[in-house]
A protein has these predicted regions:
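Conserved beta-strand in the GNAT
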Residues: 65, 70-86
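C-terminal "cap" of GNAT-fold acetyltransferases
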Residues: 146-161
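Conserved GNAT-fold acetyl-CoA-binding loop/helix
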Residues: 35-53
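A short beta-loop-alpha structural element at the N-terminal edge
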Residues: 5-31
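Conserved acyl-CoA
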Residues: 103-118, 136
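A short helix-loop-beta-strand connector motif used in the catalytic cores of GNAT acetyltransferases and
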Residues: 53-65, 116, 151
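A short, internal acetyl-CoA/4′-phosphopantetheine-binding micro-motif in the GNAT/acyltransferase core
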Residues: 86-102
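Conserved beta-strand-loop-alpha-helix junction that forms the acyl-donor binding cleft
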Residues: 118-134, 139, 145-150
Length: 161
């Protein structure tokens, strides 16, 4: 575990299919990410999937892995110290989409208690991420050309009230 990593918020049994990330999840997920997610990380920060996942793991105070019914990783998401939230997934996330949506909304609400502002930028073309963010209660602030490739992204936010 990286130095300075904050103690994980307690994940109760009720959060089925989401567990604390271990670094081997990065190795497993990197070559399997969705095309849309690969494009989003390349256009925003110019990293390859392995670099993006490793960076997310190392820079996030809280990092979680989404697993299927056989405990196989299908995605990762996390939050950095300033409330920057992110999600990267494989195409297999569609197989567990209903349970993931139900559980991730609970986890995002729990995260929002710790981080009063959750925010980031999302590629306007990444429909799965846009739907997930809306489902979890995020609001879209503005559309701007963003990142190393200056592609259209939405800035999004969720405030704890």
């Amino acid at each position: 575990m990286p130095v300075g990593k904050v103690t994980m918020l307690p994940l109760h049994k009720e959060f089925n299919g989401i567990r604390k990330t271990i670094f081997t999840d990065v190795d497993y997920l990197a070559p399997r990410l969705r095309v849309e997610d690969k494009r989003e990380i390349l256009d925003s920060v110019g990293l390859n999937p392995y670099q993006a996942l490793a960076n997310g793991y190392n820079s996030s105070e809280i990092c979680l892995t989404i697993i299927d019914t056989k405990d196989i990783p299908v995605g990762m998401f996390g939050v950095g110290e300033t409330g920057i939230i992110w999600l990267l997934a494989t195409p297999e996330i569609h197989r567990i989409r209903f349970s993931f949506l139900r559980e991730s909304r609970k986890v995002v609400n729990l995260l929002n208690h710790k981080y009063k502002i959750l925010w980031n930028f999302v590629d306007c073309r990444n429909e799965l991420h846009l739907r997930w963010l809306k489902w979890c209660g995020f609001k879209f602030l503005r559309k701007i050309n963003y990142g190393v490739n200056q592609k259209p992204f939405f800035e999004f936010i969720k405030l704890y009230v």
